[in-house]
Amino acid sequence: MTATLERRESANLWGRFCEFITSTENRLYIGWFGVIMIPCLLTAISVYIIAFVAAPPVDIDGIREPVSGSLLYGNNIISGSVIPMSNAIGLHFYPIWEAASLDEWLYNGGPYLMVVCHFLLGIACYMGREWELSFRLGMRPWIAVAYSAPVAAATAVFLIYPIGQGSFSDGMPLGISGTFNFMIVFQAEHNILMHPFHMLGVAGVFGGSLFSAMHGSLVTSSLIRETTENESANAGYKFGQEEETYNIVAAHGYFGRLIFQYASFNNSRSLHFFLAVWPVVGIWFTAMGISTMAFNLNGFNFNQSVVDSQGRVINTWADIINRANLGMEVMHERNAHNFPLDLASVEAPAVNG
């Protein structure tokens, strides 16, 4: 009898837990994805803050030359970062218990992998949680689909790229100057500026910013006048009011006259679909570009494409970029390589005699 009561109480407790987790009445929706998301993101944030403040230098290149990244080891907010894992570890899974000691784990950059793994799982679950809440409220799933763009971009730089390059040491450092270093080295090794998918991503991000500013300014300017022409149009409104304050027909008429008629949307759903799709598709393409360049399918190479009638090279901007790439490649990991990879890979000429 006692066992039966205990089982009932246990089942009742589990039922109440399930109800709490899936309730849309909570101030913050948790959801089943949230059960995984919350501990993962808390772990990633905690380890990141501790490592950014106090982690010892990391042997990122695997050549016994540690690089300092934390505030307590001489960095500031701009120069500091969580340094990627050592090249000596490669792609091995490297939790704390795989190291001989905590000092070894820190020296080889273990915190980086810990942050990245928990962060990627956390943001993936955040995306799932967006879908889950939409489902429970009877909404369509496009919020989660839109969020998949930054999730894909983060996965590309933190996971796909290191896998393609053979080492987590090639992942993006977790800091401001580290991000810039990653971008410069990426350009040097993969010529990303000449990759069409990156160009589409730039169009998506900059275009999305432009369209967002245009839409917001147009909506806030197209007021339905509630006052006479002798008063300010703003006098008929209070901040944060629930009633609609703008007239899409007026906005359509204004914009159609500013550019031309068919450059303007007269359908609110079409307009907002466009505003969502433009940046999302652009960032999807960038993530795909990073993922292909991870396996060295690089940007276009138009070096020395133009020659005169005597066969002499006439430099184009492609040649200028190539020269900059070689300079950047020479400078990075300068003690790990005797030559840039582009120069070292060329077969040496035969010597007669």
UniProtKB/Swiss-Prot annotation:
Membrane topology listed for this record: Multi-pass membrane protein
Positions with a binding annotation for a quinone: 215, 264-265
Site (Tyrosine radical intermediate): 161
InterPro entries xref list: D1/D2, Photo_II_D1/D2_sf, Photo_RC_L/M, Photo_RC_L/M_CS, PSII_D1
Keywords, alphabetical: Acetylation, Calcium, Chlorophyll, Chloroplast, Chromophore, Electron transport, Herbicide resistance, Iron, Magnesium, Manganese, Membrane, Metal-binding, Oxidoreductase, Phosphoprotein, Photosynthesis, Photosystem II, Plastid, Thylakoid, Transmembrane, Transmembrane helix, Transport
Note on cofactor: The D1/D2 heterodimer binds P680, chlorophylls that are the primary electron donor of PSII, and subsequent electron acceptors. It shares a non-heme iron and each subunit binds pheophytin, quinone, additional chlorophylls, carotenoids and lipids. D1 provides most of the ligands for the Mn4-Ca-O5 cluster of the oxygen-evolving complex (OEC). There is also a Cl(-1) ion associated with D1 and D2, which is required for oxygen evolution. The PSII complex binds additional chlorophylls, carotenoids and specific lipids.
N-acetylthreonine sites (modified residues): 2
Catalytic activity: 2 a plastoquinone + 4 hnu + 2 H2O = 2 a plastoquinol + O2
Chain sites annotated for binding chlorophyll a PD1: 198
EC assignment: 1.10.3.9
Transmembrane feature ranges: 29-46, 118-133, 142-156, 197-218, 274-288
Alphabetical GO biological process terms: photosynthetic electron transport in photosystem II; response to herbicide
Name this polypeptide is given: Photosystem II protein D1
Organism: Mesostigma viride (Green alga)
